[in-house]
């Protein structure tokens, strides 16, 4: 079984690769992990992982730079139901649009938009609320 982590210029590839390899080894699974932008390797994989670090528009631009990648992803994930994991902005890109820095068209797989969290609670600014926020 092949797990492909797509390399489109995102910054956390090694961390994602190491996490998958550690989990595979710890559980004695028979999976191979590949980090690639090669469309044939992606097409022949069993699982696709799209990581993402950076801004929504920059990540979308990275996908567009690999000719045929967006079309292949749609075919494999949406049409052929290949298992897919989007991590961070890789997950956000499945939406219709993102509004970080500017309005950017996403993959359109999931209805909805990605918008900045407003750190308000009952119309009061929450002091020291960091964005992005984990948890």
Where do the PLM segments sit?
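Extreme N-terminal starter segment of soluble prokaryotic enzymes
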Residues: 1-4
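Amphipathic alpha-helical repeat scaffolds
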Residues: 7-15, 55
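Residues that form or flank phosphate/diphosphate-binding pockets in enzymes
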Residues: 14, 43, 102
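Short helix-loop-beta junction
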Residues: 19-30
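Short gly/ser/thr-rich secondary-structure transition/capping motifs
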Residues: 28-35, 65-68
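Short acidic low-complexity segments
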Residues: 32-44
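Cysteine-nucleophile active-site neighborhood
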Residues: 47, 53-133
């Amino acid at each position: 079984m092949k797990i492909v982590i797509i390399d489109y210029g995102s910054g956390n590839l090694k961390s994602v690769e190491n996490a998958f390899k550690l989990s595979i080894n710890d559980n004695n699974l028979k999976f191979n992990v590949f980090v690639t932008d090669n469309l044939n390797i992606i097409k022949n994989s069993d699982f696709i992982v799209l990581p993402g670090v950076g801004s929504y528009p920059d990540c979308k631009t990275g996908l567009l730079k690999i000719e045929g990648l967006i079309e292949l992803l749609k075919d494999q994930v949406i049409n052929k139901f290949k298992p897919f994991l989007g991590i961070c902005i890789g997950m956000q890109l499945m939406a219709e649009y993102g509004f970080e820095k500017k309005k950017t068209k996403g993959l359109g797989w999931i209805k909805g938009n990605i918008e900045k969290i407003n750190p308000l609670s009952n119309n009061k600014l929450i002091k020291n609320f960091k964005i992005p926020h984990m948890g």
